[in-house]
Every structure is written in structure tokens, then in C-alpha cells.
């Protein structure tokens, strides 16, 4: 994850998305059949489980099951191994998906910059393979 810091400060920061901001491109851009991610746990369920705001993500329903299991089988902490595994695996998949979205955003920003540069060159009259008349003389 630290590679984005190197690219952001030492490379071209204009094509590096901000990891704390929402993506600028629509999620279905290039993927017409792509489904939007939906929360499984409702706001009321998360409030009833007293989840902190940092833990209210797409894996909150697994965390609610884990906390309920821990509460129901209190002295036996090893009884909730499967619930813990499910929550950890969901968090891992969510992390990987967010990193893929970050990379997708970065590549789309690079593509946008290349297209703008090409359009600016064509507006000047310097397309690919063309020579400026001043240079030709």
C-alpha cells in the first residue's frame, strides 16, 4: 500500500488519486453489467450492535455475528473460530477490492491525461506524423 505514497510525492501527482476521497469515475464505467455494492447489515442492526463508526463497513454483518457468538459463548473463546475467519476473510476481500478500485482510478486518470494531451496536440495542428510548418522550413 505504500507504493501510492512514492508515486504521489515523487511521480506525477495529477494522475494519482487521493485514497481518502471517493472515486471520480462512475463505478460502471467500462462495465455495463457491474452491480453496485450493497450493505447487508442495516443501519438499525449496526446501531443495535453498538458498532463504532470505523467498523461499519461492508463486512459489518459478519462482525455482528462474531460479537453475538462471543457474547453467547463467553468463557469458551475458541467457539467462534469460524465467525472470526468469515469476518477476517470478508475484510481481506474488501481490502483487495478497494485496492483494485484505487488502481482502476489511477489508470483511468492516466488515460484521461493522455487523451487530453493528444487532443491538445491535435488542436495545435500537430497530429501524429505531422510536422509543424515552421520546423519543416
From Swiss-Prot:
Chain positions of motif Cx9C motif 1: 59-69
GO cellular component: a single term: mitochondrial intermembrane space
Keywords: Disulfide bond, Electron transport, Lipoprotein, Membrane, Mitochondrion, Mitochondrion inner membrane, Myristate, Phosphoprotein, Respiratory chain, Transport
Membrane topology: Peripheral membrane protein
Positions of modified residues (Phosphoserine): 73
Principal location class: mitochondrion
Annotated spans, Disordered: 113-137
Lipid addition sites, N-myristoyl glycine: 2
Motif Cx9C motif 2: chain residues: 80-90
GO molecular function: NADH dehydrogenase (ubiquinone) activity
PANTHER family to which the protein is assigned, alphabetical: NADH DEHYDROGENASE [UBIQUINONE] 1 BETA SUBCOMPLEX SUBUNIT 7, NADH:UBIQUINONE OXIDOREDUCTASE B18-LIKE SUBUNIT
Name this polypeptide is given: NADH dehydrogenase [ubiquinone] 1 beta subcomplex subunit 7
Species whose genome carries this gene: Pan troglodytes
Gene transcribed to yield this protein: NDUFB7
Amino acid at each position: 500500500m505504500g507504493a501510492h505514497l512514492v508515486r504521489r510525492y515523487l511521480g506525477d501527482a495529477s494522475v494519482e488519486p487521493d485514497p481518502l476521497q471517493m472515486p471520480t469515475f462512475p463505478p460502471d464505467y467500462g462495465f455495463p453489467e457491474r452491480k453496485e455494492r450493497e450493505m447487508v447489515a442495516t443501519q438499525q442492526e449496526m446501531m443495535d450492535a453498538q458498532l463504532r463508526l470505523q467498523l461499519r463497513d461492508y463486512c459489518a454483518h459478519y462482525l455482528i455475528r462474531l460479537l453475538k457468538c462471543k457474547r453467547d459463548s463467553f468463557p469458551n473463546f475458541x467457539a467462534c473460530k469460524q465467525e472470526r475467519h468469515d469476518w477476517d476473510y470478508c475484510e481481506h476481500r474488501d481490502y483487495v477490492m478497494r485496492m483494485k478500485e484505487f488502481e482502476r482510478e489511477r489508470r483511468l486518470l492516466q488515460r484521461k491525461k493522455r487523451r487530453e494531451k493528444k487532443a491538445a496536440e491535435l488542436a495545435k495542428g500537430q497530429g501524429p506524423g505531422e510536422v509543424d510548418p515552421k520546423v519543416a522550413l
